[in-house]
UniProtKB/Swiss-Prot annotation:
Active-site residues, record numbering mapped to chain: 11 (phosphocysteine intermediate)
Protein name: PTS system fructose-like EIIB component 1
Record gene name: fryB
Class of the enzyme per the UniProt entry, highest EC level: transferase
CDD domains associated with the record: PTS_IIB_fructose
Source organism (scientific name): Escherichia coli (strain K12)
């Protein structure tokens, strides 16, 4: 089974930080060996919407948000790791590693 990381990034204005966080998470996830899909909610609406199948198949789900995402109820049945946009932008690789360590310790 392949590793799949999905994320949702959103900020109040939805101009720069949303897309900076999405790019940082995507680059770090690919580097860590994940298949990646990232939904953005910004000034241009919802882009690259995460489907029910994406959510069901995800190994890791991250919300990097500064606002409550639209259609947030899609994620109610899954563990979602919430981080700030700044954390995603500045330390995406470190965040992914921390989440992997948390998951590994929960499985022991």
């Amino acid at each position: 089974m392949s590793k799949k990381l999905i994320a949702l990034c959103a900020c109040p204005m939805g101009l720069a930080h949303t897309f900076m966080a999405a790019q940082a998470l995507e680059e770090a996830a690919v580097e860590a060996g994940y298949e990646v899909k990232i939904e953005t909610q910004g000034a241009d609406g919802i882009q690259n919407r995460l489907t029910a199948q994406d959510i069901a198949e995800a190994t890791i789900i991250i919300h990097s948000v500064a606002v409550t995402p639209e259609d947030n109820e899609r994620f109610e049945s899954r563990d979602v790791y919430e981080i700030t946009l700044q954390d995603a932008i500045k330390n995406a690789a470190g965040i992914i590693k921390e989440i992997e360590e948390m998951i590994a310790s929960e499985q022991q």
